[in-house]
Amino acid sequence: HSTHKLLNALSQASYIHVREGRGAINFSRFNQAYMMHATTSPLYAICASNDVAVSMMDGNSGLSLTQEVIDEAVDFRQAMARLYKEFTADGSWFFKPWNKEVVTDPQTGKTYDFADAPTKLLTTVQDCWVMHPGESWHGFKDIPDNWSMLDPIKVSILAPGMGEDGELEETGVPAALVTAWLGRHGIVPTRTTDFQIMFLFSMGVTRGKWGTLVNTLCSFKRHYDANTPLAQVMPEL
């Protein structure tokens, strides 16, 4: 996997994981096959950064760093969910986080709106992220139960324009337009589709950084609602 995306390794750094399962791999044979495709003059700084990443993840420090990433991603999701509730309650629109709208505490049976759920519940209970059949939010009608779940740190937000059934609505905000606006402010999403924008939370993403993202999305909404001429907000288009 790409260690430069989620761990603190240099760009282009990655690991190959060899699992000692029922069909064990002959390491010598694997190594020879790997060397056929590897350079004999690697950039040793990249190799060293992988070693540093391993040391950082060793023991409790790795658990703490990973938990911080999950906590920040969940805080961002909840902030977006609260803004979505606030704007839609006034008959307006906003971007919606793609996750469950309601979660249940398995210990107490109490149900919470996602925006108001305890952080500990969302960061420790796996069922808060599982896609169950019959739920409309994920759009997969025939998905087997407990077959798939969201990764909390891969945060997708939905722009208005497509219903939960996958059908286009009468009006909407193209995600590509939002991505262009974010790019003008130095924010590069991980992926953009028709009405969905994904952001990958990793080590180093702090409340200050995702707070800037929230403010930039709010500024897009202000310009959109004011019908500001495109030539003023994005003249390069």
State the predicted function of each range.
Residues 60-237:
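Non-catalytic terminal extensions of PLP-dependent enzymes
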